[in-house]
Curated annotation (Swiss-Prot):
The gene coding this protein: luxR
GO MF, one example: DNA binding
Record note on what altering residue 250 to S does: In strain: ATCC 7744
Matches recorded under PROSITE patterns: HTH_LUXR_1, HTH_LUXR_2
Entry keywords, A to Z: Activator, DNA-binding, Luminescence, Quorum sensing, Transcription, Transcription regulation
Record domain HTH luxR-type: where: 176-241
Family stated for the protein in its record: Belongs to the autoinducer-regulated transcriptional regulatory protein family.
Function comment: Transcriptional activator of the bioluminescence operon. Binds to the OHHL autoinducer.
Entry-linked CDD domains: LuxR_C_like
Organism ancestry: Bacteria, Pseudomonadati, Pseudomonadota, Gammaproteobacteria, Vibrionales
Protein name as it appears in the record: Transcriptional activator protein LuxR
One GO term (biological process): quorum sensing
Amino acid sequence: MKNINADDTYRIINKIKACRSNNDINQCLSDMTKMVHCEYYLLAIIYPHSMVKSDISILDNYPKKWRQYYDDANLIKYDPIVDYSNSNHSPINWNIFENNAVNKKSPNVIKEAKTSGLITGFSFPIHTANNGFGMLSFAHSEKDNYIDSLFLHACMNIPLIVPSLVDNYRKINIANNKSNNDLTKREKECLAWACEGKSSWDISKILGCSERTVTFHLTNAQMKLNTTNRCQSISKAILTGAIDCPYFKN
């Protein structure tokens, strides 16, 4: 097994920074897959919109039959990689989950993946600035006796690439889906103080404006967030990262 060259890592990082489309990102993912001596890759990021709704963004070259079955059977509910990535940051080798299932009646996603050619693999959890999470996974169609060594070498290089990958992937897709729904600084301020339990009158005194102005900004924020009341606006703004603690910074 050939060790990963540091120059390859640096080259891929620079190539990712030059990406202008998801097709470009796919090519970089393919290069990364070859670099770690695997066949398949999957970049998946789950973006929450509410406590019950989310969007899933995926770039991959997984076998189509497996992807179709995975979606049709709603295996995301039982996928230990998804569950692990939601609450962890460290890379994980799939063989840890091979004999585990949520319960005896639940499907063992790792074992079922093997029947579709994803025999061995490992994943790197991803966490985004807007409360999204996901994973970057690599897989092989054969039982590789060196999988632990492949995993170890990948752990020394892939984490160096992931920040650039996630940042540029986000920029590309924000540019492709640009809208006029970004909250203004004043709308964020009003929502933030509403988070602290302040009334419109309280907020008006804190911000030095009229109560009517505060109501105006909160109503605009509600329209942009597609919510029906102040409480829902607050929870959705926090959940989706529309507002966060450092918003006071200029």
